[in-house]
């Protein structure tokens, strides 16, 4: 039953807040990154935190004070589930993005919210497209966004 409630909330929130997402994406297309970031900061941590609570996850953070506040960071995690992403979205104060496999970018609504979070979709089958995506992630880090990259043995197959 908990899983059903979790999925209903996951998709329900995205559907209910589709107009907000649409507005944020329009702002990004117009070059207004600050407004898009503000929308993401307002909605995404709340959504991710609720998902963690619905799953029964208790969060304890140690060492957050060691994260430099004056420059962007890249977090390389050995991620085993999507809860790692939810944790990052709820615990990091600075604007952030993700590097995700391209297949995630094919999921409606999820793709839009991830674009609002400056997510870069990585094509692991095509080395040139993968390098383009990684260069885009590097540019986002230079702009001041925290980035999370899951550790895998090989980025490109």
Feature annotation, model-predicted:
Residues 54-157:
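Soluble catalytic domains of membrane acyltransferases
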